Amino acid sequence: MRTVLLTGFEPFENEPINPSWEAVRALDGERVGDAVIVARQLPCVFGAAIDTIGELVDVLRPALVIAVGQAGGRAEMSVERVAINVDDARIADNAGAQPIDTAIVAGGPAAYFATLPIKAMVRDMRAAGVPASVSQTAGTFVCNHVFYGLMHRLSQQPDGDVRGGFIHIPYLPEQAARHPGQPSLAQETLVKGLRAAVATALSTRADVREQGGQLH
């Protein structure tokens, strides 16, 4: 049976919970087709987060890796297109580090694209009743850091057959209640969206060709 690794983050920036971890752990052990989902938590710490996901890839040998992170202020689940080779932290991570204009991998490529069928995933997430879109930026905090580190690691795999990517998700309602005016999605909606995303990523190699870009 194939393994799908889903990762979420520990809480950060004084939040008591992180919706990415709450959503992925709800899917831990669930079967999707011929695969089983394994959920693991990452530290919200530069360097350590990449080390942790790299160790998980080595131990679990998954067919698919989807890292998930919180994006407070976004109204939809955002399937990320690209990770860039820079850390530029607006706030400190959970270990107090705040790298600015620092390469994630010295001498590494400027960017990596997700190797998932991102547009097909968005299409099927929407078909399941979940607000979703393709995102053109994963930011420059620990989420992008992990996304880039993951894709760099996967690019070094001998068989090169492990696919990966990143999904940003909004606040949960209980978080939005502490941030007036901020959008949120219920946990059951987030779980439904991730389930649809995993199923499509497992069954689809070639992405659909349809509009998913933005003007700015």
From Swiss-Prot:
Annotated active site: E80, C143, H168
Source species, domain of life: Bacteria
Compartments, record wording: Cytoplasm
Reactions that this protein is recorded to catalyse: Release of an N-terminal pyroglutamyl group from a polypeptide, the second amino acid generally not being Pro
Chief location: cytoplasm
GO molecular function terms listed in the Swiss-Prot or TrEMBL record: pyroglutamyl-peptidase activity
Pfam families in alphabetical order: Peptidase_C15 (PF01470)
Statement: the UniProt record of this protein carries the keyword GTP-binding: no
Class in the EC hierarchy, top level: hydrolase
GO CC terms in record: cytosol
SUPFAM superfamilies: Pyrrolidone carboxyl peptidase (pyroglutamate aminopeptidase)
Keywords: Cytoplasm, Hydrolase, Protease, Thiol protease
GO biological process: proteolysis
Secretion signal span: none
Enzyme Commission number: 3.4.19.3
Keyword Transmembrane helix in record: no
Subunit architecture: Homotetramer.
Function: Removes 5-oxoproline from various penultimate amino acid residues except L-proline.
Family to which the UniProt record says this protein belongs: Belongs to the peptidase C15 family.
Listed PANTHER family: PROTEASE FAMILY C15 PYROGLUTAMYL-PEPTIDASE I-RELATED, PYROGLUTAMYL-PEPTIDASE I
Protein name per Swiss-Prot or TrEMBL: Pyrrolidone-carboxylate peptidase
